[in-house]
Amino acid sequence: MLILNEEQYAKNIYENKNTDIKTVLLKIGYLTRYFLHSLNKSDSDNYKETVNWMKKYHSNFDESCYSNLISDAVKKAYKRPFYSIDKIKITKSELEKIASLNNLRAEKVLFVLLCMAKQQSVSNGFTDGLVKYSITELCKTARISVPAEDREYILHNIVQNGLLGYPKKNNTQCLIVNFINDEDEVVIELDELDCQELAYAY
């Protein structure tokens, strides 16, 4: 899923309505940012509220094990205000480029990458169609069942068609979506609900 309204996403975590985050580090990161940016808590109150939340909702929580991590997250929260995206807009020419692959699995993967690139341009400040991805999560979001050894082949095929490229410094899992055209006619607008199941929006 893609997050469009990060403050609402963090609030759902705070209210224990969002259980899809499994890692403690991510939970603490969202909580400390929520306490700072949404509830205007001081650093000391931010720490206390985060500890109280973890004690309430995280089984076997031991403050001594997480004290440094929480303190660090409280400091880092200042550098990460929440972002908000109204809708992800897909244009006619973008859809035509995707459809030109004539392969449904590849089309779904590319559609997801396009949406991710548009979201990450706001969430991460990426430019020029840069998108960070995990091949496992990409296939999961696209709802395609592909043997592990064939997953990179799908991406390679899309690259060969000129629709994806690699950044000059490719030391991370990043690609460049080469066909973004925000100036064309908008034919699809994806809201928060749509972005929970992108594969079904294509």
Residue ranges and their predicted role:
Residues 1-106, 114-129, 133-179, 187-189:
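Modules that initiate DNA replication and primer synthesis
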Residues 178-202:
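Short, amphipathic alpha-helical interaction segments positioned at domain boundaries
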